[in-house]
C-alpha cells in the first residue's frame, strides 16, 4: 500500500511529496503550499482536456478502421482516401506561411550542428557519461571500434598495439586534412606545432605552414612550446582540440608529439523519461526526477568500478583556453546542453491520484512530468549554494522534448500545459521550450500546423522512423497485410516523411533558430557502418541526429566537419520535395508471395526482438539496453523498436498471414535463445521452459495477440501492467 499525503484534491505518494518539498523546492523561492495548490489546479483543469484528446484518437482510428474494412479487397484509391481523411478531420487545412518566433535559445540549438545523445535518466552513470560527452577522444573512438579493421596486425588485443595505434593516427590526420586543412601539404607530414603572432604554424620536413583558413585557430592551453599543451581549432562551429605531449605513450610514437585529437561531440543530450526507461510507480519516477535535479544542480555523482578500481564520476567543468593573441580567455562548455524528454499524453501513473467525484484516478504522467521536470530544471538556470555549481542553459530556457503527439490540437495542449506550469513555478512565459517529435502519422501529415501551434516555443523537430513506422502500421491495420519490417526503410512514405520534415522546418524559419533532427543509429557495435552511412543525415539538412553512446557521438561529430549543414539548408530553402499523396501511401504487401520459410524467418526475428527487450523491461526494469538480435548483433532497443515488431506481427495475425499458434510456437522457440543470450546475467530469470509462469513471456505474447486493440499500437499499457505485477510479487516475497 502506497503511503500518501493529501494536497487539496490530490493524494501524493509520500516519496514524491518529500522529494519535492525537501530537495526540489529549496533554492527556487517557491512556497510548498502554493506549489501543491498549483499542481492541484493544473491537474483539475487539464485532465478533462487530456482525456478528450485521447477520445479523439480512438474516434479517428475507429473511423479509419471502418473505412478500410469496407474496401479491403479493393486497391487503395489515394484520392478517395485523402478526401475521407479531410472529411473526418484527420487531415487538416495547411496554414498560411509563417516564421517561428522562439527567443532566448542557446547556441547549441540555434547555430551549432552536431550529434545528440539520448540516455535513460534513471541510470545515473549513463546520464553522467552522456552529459560529459560534449568532448570525446577521437583516438579512443577509433581504436576501440571497428572503424579501424582488426586486420594486418591491427588487432585490439589486451594491451596497446602500435600497429593499430599508427592506423588510428593516420585516420585522425586524414580527418584533420578535411576539416582544418593546411595551406599546403598534409597533417600527416607534421613534425611539430607552434603559435607565431597569433597564428598556428605546423612544422613539416619542407618548412612551416599555416592553416588554409587561419581563423580556424581558436586558442590554446598550457605554455607554448612546453612538453604538455594543446591547440584549439574550430570548423563549422564545432571545436577540435589537439593534445600535444611528446612524453606520453602515444605522443612518443608521433613525429609531432600529438597524443590525442579531442572532438566536440554530443553538443546536446536528451535525458529521457520516456521510451528508454521503465518507470511505472512513484519510486521509479522519483529516481528519475532526482537524477534530473542532480544534473541541473551539477552535483550528481556516481561510484564507478572499472578495471578493479573504484572512483566517483561527476559532471565536467567548463573548459578555458587562451585566445590566439595570447591576451584573452575563451571559455567553452564542458558539458552537453541538456533537454529532458517527458512522456506523451497517454499514460497515467499512481505517483499521484486525484478525486474525480467519488472515484480516485491516477494522474496523467505527462502532466506530472511537465510540472516536476520543470521545477527541478529551475536549478539549471542559476548557480549558488542552493542551486549547485553548474548551469545548463545560459539563456534562461528549459528544453522539454514532447513525444507521441497526434496533430496540432495535441501540440497546442502541450503549450497550454507548459504555460500553466510556468505560472505555478513563477517563470516568465516562454521559458519552457518544446521539442516536437514527428513520430506519429497525424503529426506528419499536419506538421506545418503542429509547428504553428508552438511557433513561440518550438526549438526542435525530429523524425523518429521507429515509432513513426509503428503508427503507420497501426493506423492502417485494417487495410491489409504490411510488408516485412526490413523493407519499410525503402518505402515511398519514409522518404517523403524524412524530406518533408526538413522542408517544412526550413519553410517555418528553423535555420539559425531551431534544430531539425533525425533518428537513431541502433547498431551499437557497427561503428564503421555508422561512419559510412550516417553522414547522410547532415547531408539531408539535419542539424542534429541521434547516437546511442558517447563513442558514437565522437565518430558522428566528424560528419558535421565534412558537411556544412548551413550551406545544405540554404540550398534546400524554398523547396517542397513531397506531396501529401506520397505521405499517405500505405506500405501494403502487393501480393502475399512469401515462402513459408520467409514468413517463419520474419516471425522468429520479431519474436526474438520482442522477447529480448521485454524480458529485461518487465523482469528487471531496464528500459533501454543492447539487445542481441537473432544473429547476435547488438542493437540498442527501446519501446519504439518494440512497437514496430509487435504491430507488424499483430497485422499479419489480423490478416491471416500467420496464426496464434504460429506466434506461440515462435515465442517458445525464441525464448531459450534469449535465455542463453542473458546467461551471464546473475539476476536474469529464464522464461523457458515454464513459459506461462514468466510475466515477461506473457507480456510479449500479449503485445502481439492483442496488438490490434492497443491504443495507437503503444506498448506501454501492457508493459506497465506486467512490470507492476513483477514488483508486487517481489514485495510479497519480501
UniProtKB/Swiss-Prot annotation:
Biological process, per Gene Ontology: glyoxylate catabolic process; glyoxylate cycle; tricarboxylic acid cycle
Modified residues (Cysteine sulfenic acid (-SOH)): 624
UniProtKB keywords: Cytoplasm, Glyoxylate bypass, Magnesium, Metal-binding, Oxidation, Transferase, Tricarboxylic acid cycle
Localization, UniProt: Cytoplasm
Catalytic residues in the record: 341, 638
GO MF term set: magnesium ion binding; malate synthase activity
Catalytic activities: glyoxylate + acetyl-CoA + H2O = (S)-malate + CoA + H(+)
Gene Ontology CC terms, in alphabetical order: cytosol
Principal place of residence: cytoplasm
EC number: 2.3.3.9
Transmembrane segments: none
Residues the entry annotates as binding Mg(2+): 439, 467
Residues reported to bind glyoxylate: 341, 439, 464-467
Residues annotated as binding acetyl-CoA: 118, 125-126, 276, 313, 548
Cofactor(s) required, per the database record: Mg(2+)
Protein family (similarity comment): Belongs to the malate synthase family. GlcB subfamily.
PANTHER family associated with the record: MALATE SYNTHASE G
The protein's assembly and partners: Monomer.
Functional description taken from the UniProt entry: Involved in the glycolate utilization. Catalyzes the condensation and subsequent hydrolysis of acetyl-coenzyme A (acetyl-CoA) and glyoxylate to form malate and CoA.
Family matches, as NCBIfam families: malate_syn_G, PRK02999.1
UniProt name for this protein: Malate synthase G
Amino acid at each position: 500500500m502506497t503511503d500518501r499525503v493529501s494536497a487539496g484534491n490530490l493524494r501524493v505518494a509520500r516519496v514524491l511529496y518529500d522529494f519535492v518539498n525537501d530537495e526540489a523546492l529549496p533554492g527556487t523561492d517557491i512556497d510548498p503550499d502554493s506549489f501543491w495548490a498549483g499542481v492541484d489546479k493544473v491537474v483539475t483543469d487539464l485532465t478533462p482536456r487530456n482525456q478528450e484528446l485521447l477520445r479523439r484518437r480512438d474516434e479517428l482510428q475507429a473511423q479509419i478502421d471502418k473505412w478500410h474494412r469496407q474496401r479491403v479487397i479493393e486497391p487503395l484509391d489515394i484520392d478517395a482516401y485523402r478526401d475521407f481523411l479531410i472529411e473526418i478531420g484527420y487531415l487538416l487545412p495547411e496554414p498560411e506561411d509563417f516564421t517561428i518566433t522562439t527567443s532566448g535559445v542557446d547556441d547549441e540549438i540555434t547555430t551549432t550542428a552536431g550529434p545528440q545523445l539520448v540516455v535513460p535518466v534513471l541510470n545515473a552513470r549513463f546520464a553522467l557519461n552522456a552529459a560529459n560527452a560534449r568532448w570525446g577522444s577521437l583516438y579512443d573512438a577509433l581504436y576501440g571500434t571497428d572503424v579501424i579493421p582488426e586486420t594486418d596486425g591491427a588487432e585490439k588485443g589486451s594491451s596497446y598495439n602500435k600497429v593499430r595505434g599508427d592506423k588510428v593516427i593516420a585516420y585522425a590526420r586524414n580527418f584533420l586534412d578535411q576539416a582544418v586543412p593546411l595551406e599546403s601539404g598534409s597533417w600527416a607530414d607534421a613534425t611539430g606545432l607552434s603559435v607565431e603572432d597569433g597564428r598556428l604554424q605546423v612544422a613539416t620536413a619542407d618548412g612551416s605552414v599555416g592553416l588554409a583558413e587561419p581563423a580556424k585557430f581558436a586558442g590554446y592551453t598550457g605554455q607554448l612550446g612546453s612538453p604538455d599543451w594543446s591547440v584549439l581549432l574550430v570548423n563549422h562551429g564545432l571545436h577540435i582540440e589537439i593534445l600535444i605531449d611528446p612524453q606520453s605513450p602515444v605522443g612518443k610514437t608521433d613525429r609531432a608529439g600529438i597524443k590525442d585529437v579531442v572532438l566536440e561531440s554530443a553538443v546536446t543530450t536528451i535525458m529521457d523519461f520516456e521510451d528508454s526507461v521503465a518507470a511505472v510507480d512513484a519510486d521509479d519516477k522519483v529516481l528519475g526526477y532526482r537524477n534530473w535535479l542532480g544534473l541541473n544542480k551539477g552535483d550528481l555523482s556516481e561510484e564507478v568500478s572499472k578495471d578493479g578500481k573504484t572512483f566517483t564520476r561527476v559532471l565536467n567543468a567548463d573548459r578555458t583556453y587562451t585566445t590566439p593573441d595570447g591576451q584573452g580567455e575563451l571559455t567553452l562548455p564542458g558539458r552537453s546542453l541538456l533537454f529532458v524528454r517527458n512522456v506523451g499524453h497517454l499514460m497515467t501513473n499512481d505517483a499521484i491520484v486525484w478525486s474525480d467525484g467519488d472515484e480516485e484516478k491516477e494522474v496523467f504522467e505527462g502532466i506530472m512530468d511537465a510540472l516536476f521536470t520543470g521545477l527541478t530544471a529551475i536549478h539549471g538556470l542559476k548557480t549558488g549554494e542552493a542551486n549547485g555549481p553548474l548551469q545548463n542553459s545560459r539563456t534562461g530556457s528549459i528544453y522539454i522534448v514532447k513525444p507521441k503527439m497526434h496533430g496540432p490540437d495535441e501540440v497546442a495542449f502541450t503549450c497550454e500545459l507548459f504555460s500553466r506550469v510556468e505560472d505555478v513555478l513563477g517563470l516568465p512565459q516562454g521559458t519552457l521550450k518544446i521539442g516536437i517529435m514527428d513520430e506519429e502519422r497525424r503529426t506528419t501529415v499536419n506538421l506545418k500546423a503542429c509547428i504553428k501551434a508552438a511557433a513561440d516555443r518550438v526549438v526542435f523537430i525530429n523524425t523518429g522512423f521507429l515509432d513513426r513506422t509503428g503508427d503507420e502500421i497501426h493506423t492502417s491495420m485494417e487495410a491489409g497485410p504490411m510488408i516485412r519490417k526490413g523493407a519499410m526503410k525503402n518505402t515511398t512514405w519514409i522518404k517523403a516523411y524524412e524530406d518533408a520534415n526538413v522542408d517544412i522546418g526550413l519553410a517555418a524559419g528553423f535555420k539559425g533558430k531551431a534544430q531539425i533532427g533525425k533518428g537513431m543509429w541502433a547498431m551499437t557495435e557497427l561503428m564503421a557502418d555508422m561512419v559510412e552511412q550516417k553522414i547522410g543525415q547532415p547531408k539531408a539538412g539535419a542539424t542534429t541526429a541521434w547516437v546511442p553512446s558517447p563513442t558514437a557521438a565522437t565518430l558522428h561529430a566528424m560528419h558535421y566537419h565534412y558537411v556544412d549543414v548551413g550551406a545544405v539548408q540554404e540550398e534546400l530553402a524554398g523547396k517542397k520535395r513531397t506531396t501529401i499523396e506520397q505521405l499517405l501511401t500505405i506500405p501494403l504487401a502487393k501480393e502475399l508471395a512469401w515462402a513459408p520459410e520467409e514468413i517463419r524467418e520474419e516471425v522468429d526475428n520479431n519474436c526474438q526482438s520482442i522477447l529480448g527487450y521485454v524480458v529485461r523491461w518487465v523482469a528487471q526494469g531496464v528500459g533501454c539496453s543492447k539487445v542481441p538480435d537473432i544473429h547476435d548483433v547488438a542493437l540498442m532497443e527501446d519501446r519504439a523498436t518494440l512497437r514496430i515488431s509487435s504491430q507488424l506481427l499483430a497485422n499479419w495475425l489480423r490478416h491471416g498471414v500467420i496464426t496464434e499458434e504460429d506466434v506461440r510456437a515462435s515465442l517458445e522457440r525464441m525464448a531459450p535463445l534469449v535465455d542463453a543470450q542473458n546467461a551471464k546475467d546473475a539476476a536474469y530469470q529464464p522464461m523457458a521452459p515454464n513459459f506461462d509462469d514468466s510475466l515477461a513471456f506473457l507480456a510479449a505474447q500479449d503485445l502481439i495477440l492483442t496488438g490490434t486493440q492497443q491504443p495507437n499500437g503503444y506498448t506501454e499499457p501492457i508493459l506497465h501492467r506486467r512490470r507492476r505485477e513483477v514488483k508486487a510479487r517481489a514485495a510479497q516475497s519480501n
